Amino acid sequence: MKHRRRSKQQKLNSLPPPTPPATRAPCPMPRPSASPKSPPPATPPPEQGPEVVVPEDWALATDAISSDLSSPVVLVCGPSNSGKSTFTRLLLNKLLPSYGRVGYLDTDVGQPEFSPPGCLSLHIVDEAITDMRNPVLREADRCCFYGDISSKGDPESYLNSLFLLYTYFVEKYRCPGSEMLPLIVNTPGWVKGTGFDMLVEMLRYICPTIVVLIRTRMQRKNLPDGMFWLTGGETEPKVITIDAASRDSLSKSSLKRKDGGGMRERRLVEYFKQCFSSDISLATNKELAYALASLPPYEVPFSDVTVMHLHCEVPRTEIWHSVNATIVGLASSCDTPATAHAVPWCVGLGIVRGVDVQRGLLYVITPVDVQHLQSVDLLLQGLIEIPRSVLQVKGCESPYMSTNVRDKITGKDLYASNLNSPLSRQDDGDSDSGADTM
């Protein structure tokens, strides 16, 4: 992606955004200086709640898995809100002292553990998780932008991304002469109908050495007992069955259901806070909205990028208008694996701040460092949109509704479309909505 950053005043003049209200004060924010290999500024950890109580069968399961000296591949599955994410955090901490580094394949696009919503990602973790209740953003070794919070819309693309990530892990970390890292696979909570079929495909492709089945008290929601995915002749893995943690007391509960849509919004807010230096206080959505409005965007010529629509078809004449005021995945065609179902690697997310059709320019805000942006030539547009909590800040004109395209899409239309964002959709059970937190 060829781009240039001009001075803040020059850039904002080129956009002609709506006139800000008289009460708004300028809020210039510097960009963080980070090397390509350095992780993004850490988000301050949330306050720790009551003491975490680990169920006895969970402790026995993590002990049994950590005693396996053959670098296990562990797949954790069960219905929505049964505790899969929390169990994988416990297991990750249990494996780290023995191996030093542990692979973590996150396949839940609705409630990712370490990435923003809409992503499948592989992480190589080398430090323990200190907060069992709240997931924290981490830099991914590899990431695929699926572009939705549910795999129901395009199961084939979802599985292609998952298989690509697992193949990459095997080739880099489990081939002869490599470290032979263990791997934890966290799966979505959609385990009925097509969701069950997709889980079976995952199990058959990955061939885990250990499968952890989490069961709830509602029998109709549970997966079948035993090795339900095998057809005969395959190597049988070890199956460990545990119960979902009880919730009888908030002070001693291992799990607490949270609003899935709200958690997705908060995760995106935390992601785009990385656009700013870690010493800048952005404690409220209002502060973040002002900061994003003041941040000089990157200028991206139309000729330098191709827009890929992941879940819809858009007329060629409307391609550039369609990405205005949206979140896009930033990817490179050069790094796309040469496979039958090629899925480009995603280096991060960006907000299309505005579109200048006459000059052929996009204006993009992203926390991705300049070195990684040099190779970006694909914008992946899905259904992940700007958090409503940022758009609805009073006294701050949204910077994402550029008047450059008002003849095609009015600000009112864009505002309405964001109110119907998939981030605020009712959870349909295919992800761990509300997350399993300790």
What annotation goes with each model-predicted range?
Residues 80:
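The conserved Walker
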Residues 171-233:
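Phosphate/Mg2+-binding loops and adjacent switch elements
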Residues 98, 118, 206-207, 235:
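Short, structured coil segments at secondary-structure junctions
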Residues 53-56, 61, 69-74, 103-183, ...:
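Nucleotide-state-sensitive switch-loop elements of NTP-binding domains
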Residues 86:
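Conserved Walker
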Residues 1-72, 76, 90, 94, ...:
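Preference for solvent-exposed, low-hydrophobicity sequence contexts
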Residues 63-64, 91-94, 164-172, 201-202:
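A generic secondary-structure signal
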Residues 83:
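Conserved glycine(s) of the Walker
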